A protein has these predicted regions:
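Nucleotide-activated chemistry modules centered on ATP-dependent adenylation/adenylyltransferase
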Residues: 2-18, 23-414
């Protein structure tokens, strides 16, 4: 149905609120009750944001919520959303590893599931009208539950009249909500999950200004502050799935956590990017994705040994489109599923071991092995082998270059 004023009398109906416990979503609870008469069911979806969740039940209750769900979906997030992006080497505009983009559909799916369980008629989110998140949440909800209303308070300016955090805090106080909220002065706008942390705002809004990395970084150190010695590691893969780190079997969630630690202390995966948002504007952000950067580099390192040239060329095209579709919030679209099906078909023999060394922001290849390797040492050698004779190249060059030869002869005749 989309984001609009609910039709008819909504008093007593249930609405699902994507809830973090912060100021915005706290203020939304009494606002929904006052303006629409909704019973508010809060849902916090844990995708590894590392926030303190223990006080959320009390905060939601004091804010007037009927109920709170805290949904721990980190393993589901890894297996159903992160893994397809790893296998697709997903990267938007050559730098952004889609940390927020892949998390929003996972959250939207859980919001819809609880809406159906609770018999809710609507879902509400606190995303602003300028960013990509509103699109990702709403496209996911529309795809999974088109019958649900979607409320986006920041776009409902006739009713959501707050102009500042101070306005929101005054409103909460007026409604008897006496809770502490962290100050946003001198702080970045951040999004964190198991895969990454994004930073926006403050000096990053000026593209001429260097990021204040000392103040900004949370997962990582700068390459200049990384250790002076290399950190070696190996990753074992089975059909495009990373299954072991340094010989130790572990889940994808565990591996990402460990690689975030190893990569972070070596200054891996810090990018400063100006990206093109879906809504048309450019935005600047700094992203920390240490574990994800290592996994994607290792995966590409293994694929280049195993996949034939034409498959790699086609996969590159699919990867770019896959990344765009995910960035635009179309996770549940048939196109994303079709693109993923192609990617998955290429992973059948992507098994083996990738070795690398981490050093001051760099990932240095240290060897790759696979039982499905297409690398043939006797073919690649400069010496003549049984399968290849240097003389064979002459006929190939004649045929391969025939169009150029014909064109040159034609131009000479003219």
């Amino acid at each position: 149905m989309g984001s609009m004023m609910p039709e008819g009398n909504t008093k007593g109906e249930k609405i699902i609120l994507a809830y973090s416990g912060g100021l915005d979503t706290t203020a939304i609870i009494p606002w929904l009750k006052e303006n629409f008469g909704y019973k508010v069911v809060c849902v916090c979806v844990d995708v590894g944001q590392e926030e303190e969740l223990s006080d959320l039940p009390e905060r939601a209750k004091l804010s007037g919520a009927e109920k709170l769900y805290i949904e721990h979906i980190q393993d589901e997030f890894c297996e159903e959303y992160v893994l397809p992006c790893i296998q697709a080497n997903a990267c938007y505009e050559n730098k952004y590893l889609l940390g927020t983009s892949m998390a929003r559909p996972a959250i939207a799916k859980r919001l819809v599931e609880i809406a159906k369980k609770e018999g809710a008629s609507a879902i509400c989110h606190g995303a602003t009208g300028k960013g990509n998140d509103q699109i990702r949440f709403e496209l996911g909800i529309k795809a999974l539950a088109p019958e649900l209303h979607i409320l986006a308070p920041w776009r409902m300016t006739e009713l959501w009249t707050f102009q500042s955090r101070e306005d929101e805090m005054a409103y909460c106080k007026e409604k008897g909500i006496d809770l502490a909220f962290g100050s946003h002065e001198n702080s970045y706008s951040r999004d964190r999950n198991l895969w990454h942390i994004s930073h926006e705002g403050l000096e990053l809004e000026d593209p001429e200004t260097e990021p204040n990395y000392e103040h900004l970084l949370m997962l990582s150190v700068t390459p200049q502050k990384a250790p002076d010695q290399e950190t070696p590691l190996s990753i074992t893969w089975e059909k495009g799935v990373p299954v072991a780190l340094n010989g130790k079997k572990m889940s994808l969630k565990e591996m990402i956590e460990e690689l975030n630690h190893l990569g972070g202390k070596n200054g891996i995966g810090i990018v400063d990017i100006v990206e093109n948002r879906v809504v048309g504007m450019k935005s600047r952000g700094v992203y920390e994705t240490p574990g994800g950067t290592i996994l994607l580099e290792a995966h590409k390192q293994l694929e280049e040994l195993i996949l034939d040239r034409q498959t790699m060329e086609m996969k590159k095209i699919v990867e770019e489109k896959f990344s765009q579709v995910v960035y635009e919030g179309k996770w549940f679209a048939p196109l994303r599923e079709a693109l993923q099906a192609f990617v998955k078909s290429t992973q059948e023999k992507v098994s083996g071991e990738t070795k690398m060394k981490l050093y001051k922001g760099n990932i240095i290849k240290a060897g790759t092995s696979s039982p499905y390797s297409l690398y043939n040492a006797s073919l690649a050698s400069f010496t003549t082998g049984d399968l290849y004779d240097h003389k064979d190249a002459g006929g190939f060059i004649t045929l391969f270059g025939l169009p150029e030869l014909v064109r040159a002869l034609q131009e000479k005749k003219a």
